[in-house]
């Protein structure tokens, strides 16, 4: 029992020593990855020839990338500042206003997505728990570069025999930046693991701001990135 206790104590000591980094070191880390984003209360209302289609939003995938600087102010704590691009927004399932079993003229919408393009400035404190393993939290202001809605609309006619004749799909892409807030503030929390200067990280952003000017809607976003740490000051 005593031997097990000392082995556990030794393991704890080794983990804590190996987790320590040199105080005063400065690094930069280019990184790229994937964002999975949605908008809370982000339902889209399609008005088609007097018919309203209320469609809930779903998560969409996007690109994120940039660089972060980190200064080691304590042996187990670092402060980082970054500049990242992130594609956020949401995706919508395909819908139409067709009444099944009833002849008439209808419209269908497909490949509908909302894209919000942000520059993010994350400021985080990282706590190194063990060799290569860290947890992070901080604050992140973001600035909206642009917002676009894209979808394909197809008009079609259903005959009395149930057969349908479709017009060619029309692609629509329009800027809707004026509908959205110019900035966003979020609390990022994450966990990372580093091996041989390669850093894999997952974060979630708790948005504090309304993303849309008139609705109580907020960004929801996960990010998964891979970066490479370069030493500037040792």
Predicted regions and their residues:
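Outer-membrane beta-barrel channels and translocator barrels
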Residues: 23, 74-76, 130, 195-198, ...
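Bacterial Sec-dependent N-terminal signal peptides
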Residues: 1-31, 226, 230-232
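Outer membrane beta-barrel transmembrane domains
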Residues: 167-203, 219-234
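Extracellular/periplasm-exposed beta-strand and loop segments of Gram-negative cell-envelope proteins
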Residues: 38-60, 87-117, 144-184, 188, ...
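Transmembrane beta-strand segments that form the barrel wall of outer-membrane beta-barrel proteins
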Residues: 202-212
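Residues on the lipid-exposed face of transmembrane beta-strands in outer-membrane beta-barrel proteins
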Residues: 30-34, 63-71, 83-85, 121-129, ...
């Amino acid at each position: 029992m005593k031997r097990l206790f000392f082995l556990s104590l030794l393991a704890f000591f080794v983990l804590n020593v190996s987790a320590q980094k040199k105080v005063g070191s400065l690094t930069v880390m280019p990184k790229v990855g994937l964002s999975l984003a949605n908008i809370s209360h982000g339902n889209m209302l399609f008005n088609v020839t007097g018919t309203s289609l209320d469609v809930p939003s779903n998560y969409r995938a996007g690109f994120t990338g940039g660089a972060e600087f980190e200064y080691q102010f304590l042996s187990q704590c670092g402060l980082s500042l970054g500049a990242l691009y992130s594609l956020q927004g949401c995706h919508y399932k395909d819908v139409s206003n067709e009444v099944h079993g009833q002849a008439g003229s209808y419209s269908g919408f497909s490949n509908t997505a909302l894209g919000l393009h942000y520059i993010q400035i994350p400021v985080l404190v990282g706590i190194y728990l063990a060799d290569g393993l860290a947890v992070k939290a901080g604050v992140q202001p973001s600035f909206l570069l642009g917002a676009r809605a894209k979808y394909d609309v197809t008009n079609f006619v259903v005959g009395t025999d149930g057969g349908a004749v479709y017009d060619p799909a029309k692609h629509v892409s329009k800027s809707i930046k004026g509908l959205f807030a110019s900035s966003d503030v979020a609390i990022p929390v994450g966990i990372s693991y580093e091996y041989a200067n390669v850093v894999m990280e997952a974060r979630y952003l708790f948005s504090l701001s309304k993303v849309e000017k008139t609705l109580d809607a907020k960004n929801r976003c996960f990010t998964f990135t891979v970066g490479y740490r370069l030493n500037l000051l040792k």
